[in-house]
């Protein structure tokens, strides 16, 4: 009976880890098909941010320049002009299709992540007792570690998150989150997040050491600074 009670929180933890993947897999076909039909049949107002609007304007300007070039080539045979106009028409249709696919992709991923968040929040709310048991297990495990091991783990975690080589890792992680939510890759936004987020984490971590660890375990702070130096 005791083993069964101990196994239930562990099974609950595994289900939380794999739940988002399972939701994404279930919604992949049904939700995407519904969003595609909704987008293609209903005349929706398109909301564009400044970067997307600039990109669209640049593409339309390129198409306009091609049409102007078409007017300048009227001395060419009519058959060549018809082929040229047909190519421009195909490019325009292709551009519209790509834009629609991008909007559908964005709506689909945002909806999937929103559904996952709501379900996981409800799942966690109804399983507070199991989460409390898992939290007590983690605290007991960390408490039984020596101060040297704790200092080593803290140093390893901080070097991974806010160390010298961390910007590349943050760039990959933020880029993955952008892709998961269906957003386009914007270098300016990505650079801004990579340059500011580790700094904020570093400040929070130093404040945590000053306020919490100095009071709870001064020896751990001494060992941490000795290893860090």
Swiss-Prot record:
Subcellular localization, as worded in the UniProt entry: Plastid, Chloroplast inner membrane
Protein topology in the membrane: Multi-pass membrane protein
InterPro entries, alphabetized: CemA
Catalysis: reaction(s): K(+)(in) + H(+)(out) = K(+)(out) + H(+)(in)
Gene Ontology molecular function terms on file: antiporter activity; proton transmembrane transporter activity
Organism of this sequence: Aethionema grandiflorum
Functional summary from the UniProt entry: Contributes to K(+)/H(+) antiport activity by supporting proton efflux to control proton extrusion and homeostasis in chloroplasts in a light-dependent manner to modulate photosynthesis. Prevents excessive induction of non-photochemical quenching (NPQ) under continuous-light conditions. Indirectly promotes efficient inorganic carbon uptake into chloroplasts.
Protein name as it appears in the record: Potassium/proton antiporter CemA
First-listed, main subcellular location of the protein, grouped into a coarse class: plastid
PANTHER family (alphabetical): CHLOROPLAST ENVELOPE MEMBRANE PROTEIN, CHLOROPLAST ENVELOPE MEMBRANE PROTEIN-RELATED
Keywords associated with the record: Antiport, Chloroplast, Hydrogen ion transport, Ion transport, Membrane, Plastid, Plastid inner membrane, Potassium, Potassium transport, Transmembrane, Transmembrane helix, Transport
């Amino acid at each position: 009976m005791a083993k069964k009670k101990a196994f239930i929180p562990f099974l609950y933890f595994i289900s939380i880890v794999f739940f988002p993947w399972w939701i994404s897999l279930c919604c992949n076909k049904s939700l995407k098909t519904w969003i595609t039909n909704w987008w293609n049949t209903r005349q929706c107002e398109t909301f564009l941010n400044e970067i997307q609007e600039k990109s669209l304007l640049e593409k339309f300007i390129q198409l306009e320049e091609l049409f102007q070039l078409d007017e300048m080539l009227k001395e060419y045979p009519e058959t060549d002009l018809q082929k040229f106009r047909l190519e421009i028409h195909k490019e325009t249709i292709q551009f519209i299709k790509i834009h629609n696919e991008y909007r559908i992709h964005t709506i689909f991923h945002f909806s999937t992540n929103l559904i996952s968040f709501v379900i996981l929040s409800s799942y966690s709310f109804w399983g507070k007792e199991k989460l409390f048991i898992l939290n007590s297990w983690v605290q007991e495990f960390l408490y039984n570690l020596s101060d040297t091991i704790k200092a080593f783990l803290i140093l390893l975690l901080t070097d991974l998150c806010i160390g010298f080589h961390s910007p590349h890792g943050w760039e990959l992680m933020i880029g993955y989150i952008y892709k998961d939510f269906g957003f386009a890759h914007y270098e300016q936004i990505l650079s801004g997040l990579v340059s500011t987020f580790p700094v904020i984490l570093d400040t929070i971590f130093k404040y945590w050491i000053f306020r919490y660890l100095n009071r709870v375990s001064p020896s751990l702070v001494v060992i941490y600074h000795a290893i860090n130096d």
